[in-house]
């Protein structure tokens, strides 16, 4: 069930689902696995926000176990294509493609809440059928592994051989460790207290 927010204005009350209300504040929330449906929603929201104001940052909050590499790369490419900076924030878990998207935010604007977990690893896949079909799938997985590792190396500043070694198996990090690694830029402890006028 999606929560509804009710706002009052001079013309009466208006109800929004919570995600539509957040979108008005330029906040996109990835709170599920990366699938064709979730990726299409996120890409559409980013394109909408760019059209609405190409100068204002977009905020992508991530709590995701990962998911489809192809769909995640669609989000990644859109993040690189649009004009607004994309600030990424991990809330809970950014694993696999979730961690890749977290790292894909604008450098200097990638962060995590203090008790979140971040995990990188190599792409997963499976194949069945004739030997030639299995080889095609294996070659594709190796290609994707190379692309993802190269992007992680470019975005973290880590040498490619270290990325290859660290992504060979599940590699979990705390937010502080992710800052040291170069996946994110800061850990959010608490919101600054607003001065009361």
From Swiss-Prot:
Cell compartments where the protein resides: Cytoplasm
Does Cytoplasm show up as a keyword for this record? yes
Q: What is this enzyme's class at the first EC digit?
A: hydrolase
| Gene Ontology CC annotation, any one | cytoplasm
Write down the species.
Synechococcus sp. (strain CC9902)
Query: Which GO annotations describe the biological process of this protein?
Result: protein quality control for misfolded or incompletely synthesized proteins
Q: What is its main location?
A: cytoplasm
Query: In its UniProt entry, what is this protein called?
Result: ATP-dependent Clp protease proteolytic subunit 1
Gene3D superfamilies linked: 2-enoyl-CoA Hydratase, Chain A, domain 1
